[in-house]
């Protein structure tokens, strides 16, 4: 049984802030993301994440905005930044690595991005998120629904869906987000 990181109100608000930054309207309202690769989508998401987290650090009392930005940039690891690497997690002889990690506020957060329109795409990300949950305090799993009728996004309020996403959150600290 793994010990879970506690879900204080402060931590939940911080995770919500990150969730909002990575699903910003400027990204999914304007970007033709169906035609973009996952890497290109991450390139669009990164500056929003930096900006929102910088504002957060400034709000926490760091008056120097440039210094706040440095703090944030050194807290985010992702493959798009040549100066950082995200460590692999070995599981059943396979190497697994989240798309992005954030270490801030005494929390280690993994972010997994998946783009797709089929159940297999969706399930792959859930499986990866569960592996990351063993090494990180929280996992944010952002699934980008590129199905023509948005059927995955539209189904997220269903009873089975809410039950599973509730279980992932309650038992694994995985926050499931669909864009």
Segments and roles (model prediction):
Residues 33-34, 43, 55-107, 119-121:
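Active-site metal-binding core of divalent-cation-utilizing nuclease and nuclease-like domains
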Residues 114:
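Activation of the activation-loop gatekeeper triad in protein kinase-fold domains
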